[in-house]
Amino acid sequence: VIGGDECDINEHRFLVFLTXASGLACGGTLIN
């Protein structure tokens, strides 16, 4: 997991498209 944590996708709905399109876990690299 890129962000170092497992994320609840329901808490990160705005990242769903990022996760699906880029394969990022919770958009960790984008958040950081």
UniProtKB/Swiss-Prot annotation:
Top-level EC class: hydrolase
Keyword tRNA processing: no
Keywords, comma-separated and alphabetical: Disulfide bond, Fibrinogenolytic toxin, Glycoprotein, Hemostasis impairing toxin, Hydrolase, Protease, Secreted, Serine protease, Toxin
Compartment(s): Secreted
Enzyme Commission numbers on file: 3.4.21.-
Membrane-traversing stretches: none
Keyword match Glycoprotein: yes
Matching InterPro entries: Peptidase_S1_PA (IPR009003), Peptidase_S1_PA_chymotrypsin (IPR043504)
Functional note: Cleaves a kininogen analog with the release of kallidin (lysyl-bradykinin). Completely cleaves fibrinogen Aalpha chain, partially cleaves Bbeta chain and has no activity on gamma chain.
Subunit structure: Monomer.
Protein name (record): Snake venom serine proteinase
Lineage: Eukaryota, Metazoa, Chordata, Craniata, Vertebrata
